[in-house]
Amino acid sequence: AVGATCVIKDLPGYLPMRNDARMNEMLRQNSNPLFGEENVFQGDHMTASTDMGDVSHLMPVIHPWVGCINGVLHSAEYEISVPDVAYIKTAQALAMTIVDLLYDDAVGAKDVLDNFTPALNKQSYIELLDNIAKGE
């Protein structure tokens, strides 16, 4: 109606998140006693983006979310509403998961690595980013 055009360009980075199922299960088992099983769940795909999505295409990772805030993410209204959960229980769950990965000569971490198939290798990741930046 106004004769305008619009060009949309993709920017490299922020690939979809690929949480490792084995590490997620370790974290779930460690979180249940701390938060209560009814408060721990596996989330579905989210529309939010993070550079951790890129990392997850190269190596096994998890990106847990803990519901202990009020307000909109990245806004002036964002605030911690349950400090014990934010600072203590979350750290405990993550620390217990690290122990599970490293205990007994890192048998848990070796299991995760042995069963992980990367979506990209270093070269294909760099090529993907270059192609996106070029508009291909």
Language-model-detected regions and their locations in the chain:
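Metal-dependent amide/peptide-bond hydrolase catalytic core
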Residues: 1-136
